[in-house]
Amino acid sequence: MYKKILIASLALIAGLASCKKDDPTPSPNPPSGLTIDGVASTLEFYQLDTAHLSVAGVAKDAAAKAVWAVNGAKAAEGATFDFTTAHPGKYEVTLTVDGKSAKHTYTVAPRFSEGAFLLNEGNFGNETGSLTYIHPSKKLVIDQAYYRVNGTKLGNVCQDLAFGNDQIYIISQNGPKNGGEGLLTIARSNSLEKVKVYNDETLAQQWPTHIAVLRDQIYLRTDRNGIYRGTADGGFVSIPGTSKAKKLRMAQIGERLFALTSDSKVLMIQGTQVVRELDLSPAKPSGIAVSHDGTLWVSTTSPNAILKVDPTPDNFVALDTHVLDKSISSGWSATSAFFAHGDKLYFTGQSSVIYCHDFATSKTSQIIDVKTIDGVGTSANVYYNSLGVDPATGELYYAAFEDYGTYNKKNVTMVLKADGTKLLLKEKVNSFPAGFYFIPNAASRTGANR
């Protein structure tokens, strides 16, 4: 399995290793002669990185009989040892040769504190959902990230996730099928280490598709009975007046949750009640997101437009509307028709062409047709929840595949600058994309699922 790990292995050779000032001095000091080659001092690296270690200071035949142990447990024999782990923590690596020992302590840091996740539905018939981790500045992509950390699989047809309480909440539509664990998976957001898996057959029958987390409350939008509220321990109860909630991402501001409906409304939900409704008729809502100034962006078709909406209960109205000359339809997508960075809103109309509408200047421009990017071509034939935009950096994310018969063999995932310049491109790391999600970090981010 590890041959397929798409990571940049950390070569821990003495001349290149960087020491942390607050690291303790290794103790005890190794006896004269025997050393662990490939280290300079106690080092910090990340989950799934690899430290390539070897025996030094003894004869070749003696080195071949070396025994390596990690935290006191035998891990390998021989002159070399590749140390890797999926879990953060401190690890003492001990080398023993002919009764002599040398030791080093490693601090393994959480891998997933920044960057983005691509959630994948997986094939309904024979797969489960999965997470692909992306860090464009490090040119790093790790497919099957949750599985690599936990050794278990997400539920069948994962369609949405949310961040909250330093955790990541992943909802699957069909729960524990095809070897997947469950309906709702909760993991530590910075390490992906499993916290809890929740299953509820009754709730699963409602086909949950989208999730939002407000403090300890979990909101689930379902196909069959609108929006439910509960906790990680269960107790999910349907919220009256939400039965027409659309199969699209929701947005949150403070204690209020916002959802779109099939009868052209924006619902404002607080607690277990719909406290306000904004009627957009005859327009049809196609996406919603929190703006950088704390208001709401809402897109519609018939007409194609972008609205800025006041999210306060006392003035729940559209403040401004820009009509577009391009389609901003969400089609069959379950994410949103658009994604925003500042006053710039990016959309595709379910195509391979990315457009940008600048709300400050009222101008719409074409950024790029991703099919024209070297290495893409027909691998971007099918738009399937393909677009994402990092709300902090403005970088564009795009994942697509050639056709439904070869989705797992001919697909592409990429990151672009805001002008369409390619930053990163990987093949075969998506499987029916469910959308991109950007990890909350020191840069303040707002809104559900961002």
What do these predicted regions represent?
Residues 67-84:
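Surface-exposed, flexible coil segments in extracellular/virion-facing regions
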Residues 151-162, 203-215, 244-254, 282-293, ...:
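Repeated scaffold domains used in trafficking and secretory/extracellular systems
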Residues 228-352, 357:
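Acidic, serine/threonine- and glycine-rich low-complexity intrinsically disordered segments
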Residues 59-67:
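Solvent-exposed loop segments of extracellular immunoglobulin-like
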Residues 140-153, 193-202, 234-241, 273-280, ...:
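A short beta-strand motif characteristic of beta-propeller blades
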Residues 46-59:
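A short beta-strand segment in extracellular, disulfide-stabilized domains
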